[in-house]
Each structure stands twice: as structure tokens, then as C-alpha cells.
Amino acid sequence: GSSQTRIFSEGQLLLEEKTVVAVDNTNDDILGFGTDAIIHYHTEPQRVRLEWPVKNGAMIDYYYTRGILSYFLKKGLKHSLSRPEIVMSIPSGLSSVARHALIDATMHAGAAKVYLVSSSAAAIFGQGISLGGSDVTLSVVMGRDITDCGLFSCGGIVAQEQLAFGGNSINEEIQAYVRDSLKII
């Protein structure tokens, strides 16, 4: 996602780190990914900048995304001898071009096969909710930049919607309210 990357295998969380890359300001070399990137930045903030290669749930930098995926796959699946098949959750509004680019980056990062599923559907599956009956299930997934909503019934998707509103928007509104209320500059 825009903020966090999580890798699960057989229901077990193998990795959870920030989706961020540390880059050297002097030569644009990659210095680290995830937690390592944050550490590099806090150690030398004048020399290091942080790049977030995913924005609004979409990849905005192929090179950084491929690098971070490769690093996270090796770190999260360090005991695996084979190339993994990967199921990735993505925003429902992601374009077909963006989907293809993400599959390509993931394959080049070391995946044997890549399957894409909407974030709202992934949340349903992750909770173990059965979609076989006629009951209607609403799934709302709020990320850093976007909120993904899905309505499911009779084993399928009835409707999906992506909103350009996420956790960062809420944080910014709270900060603005506190600033305005307390007259803080």
C-alpha cells in the first residue's frame, strides 16, 4: 500500500514495513528500504531523502517499486527456495495500465505468478467471511491516501468504489482544526 507493505503466508504475518525508499541526495543511490530506509533518514537527514513509490494505491515509480518488492520478498520469504505465487491487494479503481505495470514490477522482483484482488475483497477473504449466500456484505478499507469500498453478495462483487480520502486526509483535518481552534500558527 501507499503507507505499509505486509506479507502473509498461510495466515501468518511474515513482514510489515513502511513502503518507503531511502535515497542518497548526492548521487541518487538507493540506501535502504522500509525500516532500514527510516533509520538511514534519521541518521543523516541532510544527505538522505525518503521516496514513497506508491501514491493513492498506485505505483508512481517503477524502479523504486521493483526494488522495494524484491527486498521485501527476499526478507519476508527468506526460507523459501522457490519463486512465490503472490496475491496482491490493490484499489478497485486502479487502471488496467497501472495493474499491468504492477504485475510486471512484481514479476521482475522475483514472483513466479501474480494475482490481483481488490482491497475490499481481500479484507473479506482475510476475515474468513463466506460470500456464498444471499447476504450482503459491505467492506470498507481505509488506507493512507484512499478508501476502497466493496459490496458483495451471492459469491460476487455487486459494486465497488474508490474514494480519494484516507488516513492522511483525516490527520490533516484534525491538525487544521487544532491549529484553528487553539490559534496555533
Give the location of each predicted region.
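Nucleotide/phosphate-binding catalytic cleft detector across ATP-hydrolyzing
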Residues: 2-144, 152-185
